[in-house]
Amino acid sequence: MSCPRLVIAGTSSGAGKTSLTLGLTAALRRRGLKVQTFKVGPDFLDPTWLSLASERPCINLDGWMCGERYVRDRFATATADADIAIVEGVMGLFDGADPAAAAGSTAEIARWLDAPVLLVVNAHGMARSLAALVKGYAEFDPDLHLAGVIANRCGSTRHGDWLSEALCAAGMPPLTGTVIRDSLPPLPSRHLGLVTADRQHLTSEALNTLADAVERQLDMPRILDLAEKVPATPGVAATASSTEGRPVRIGMAFDEAFHFYYPDNLQALEDAGATLVRFSPMHDDTLPADLDALLLGGGYPEEYADTLETNQTMRQAVADFAAADRPIYAECGGLMYLSEGIELRDGSRHAMTGALPFATRMLATRKRLGYAEVRHLAHGPFGPAGTCLRGHEFHYSEAIAEPAAPGWQSAWQVSYRRSNKPVAEGYQRGRLFASYVHTHFASRPGAARAFVDFCRGES
């Protein structure tokens, strides 16, 4: 890994790291650099913004789900043709899957990648206290290279000068940016976080505005110098792809309502011999021809419930596919689409495919957020009973009633990071498998190959 690189971390969520990462990415691209972006953690939303800003797929780096070997190798392969890598952190620098360890944190990823860290701090109302705060972050993990500080929401450039002097006097990393309050345009959000980025939300004009703000307020020469002073850490040899067996065509739901997929999962499926055929449950009349299986990812079906309900021919096509016991794998929003209907917060109900014998409803408060380790209770898409993967849940919906129809069973035994008691989760009958857990195939070697075999009907 000889690519210049930086990790943009925050003292907490809301420090401003996403806006600054977008602006920095846009500013670097204006300088003619190929920028490869990464996002620490399991998030699906921030990567859509970073992908638009870089015009390259943003890759999730998750220490808890994927492990060090995979993270280092994935970084090396993704940056092979890049000029610089920008890694956006998650939550605060040391926040992750374990309150007493670094697992799943930005700090863990920064150490694995030997990457310098720029710490974004909300400096509103702070002076010398900023130096004390930074000192705590700098000394909390002596193996971490905290290379610079970006003071966000400053009152003035004079305020920034004061902060810079305070850091210098305390022997702390230098101030590499003074960002004046309200100088960065706000990013739109909804209940799961940021909205999914598209050119309506992140126009070229908006990117230029962010880039201008970064160029004006960050010490770009110093930041580039920090990015280049990194060791050449060897990556891990990539695993050869395996495409034995007959070709498989997997219909993948992809539109405004369904788009929560880890790029690495999709690449792994293609490497294992699958052809992914995109279709839109919102806009297409029916399923593509000659499909072996369906992949229904997460997203925002509740936001487009009326359009999904109106597309009766597509709903019937998916219901018929399920009734024929063809392989279907659904996660979160995909589960909701397979249900009898979605009940919105206003009490209205919209019909879905009815492949699952219950409806779902939106809640005013979050149902679940966190990491999950899952285990097949019976033979499933990833192998025999007992097969384990890791994943993540984040949703505001729930099943209104558990299935009473014969033949249905729970899909997973789930162990949540914040609970010592495993629970049954998801729904399985025949070759239909639906769950609220977003799994990452890198958490189990051979998972993608097993999934493709499942779609072929060979497992």
From Swiss-Prot:
Pathway: Cofactor biosynthesis; adenosylcobalamin biosynthesis; cob(II)yrinate a,c-diamide from sirohydrochlorin (anaerobic route): step 10/10. It comes from Syntrophotalea carbinolica (strain DSM 2380 / NBRC 103641 / GraBd1) (Pelobacter carbinolicus). CDD domains: CobB_N (cd05388), GATase1_CobB (cd03130). Comprises of two domains. The C-terminal domain contains the binding site for glutamine and catalyzes the hydrolysis of this substrate to glutamate and ammonia. The N-terminal domain is anticipated to bind ATP and cobyrinate and catalyzes the ultimate synthesis of the diamide product. The ammonia produced via the glutaminase domain is probably translocated to the adjacent domain via a molecular tunnel, where it reacts with an activated intermediate. The a and c carboxylates of cobyrinate are activated for nucleophilic attack via formation of a phosphorylated intermediate by ATP. CbiA catalyzes first the amidation of the c-carboxylate, and then that of the a-carboxylate. Residues 249-446 form the GATase cobBQ-type domain. PANTHER family: COBYRINATE A,C-DIAMIDE SYNTHASE (PTHR43873:SF1). PROSITE patterns: GATASE_COBBQ (PS51274). The record marks H438 as: Increases nucleophilicity of active site Cys. It comes from the Bacteria. Belongs to the CobB/CbiA family. The active site is at C332 (nucleophile). This is Cobyrinate a,c-diamide synthase. Its EC number is 6.3.5.11. One of its GO terms (biological process) is cobalamin biosynthetic process.
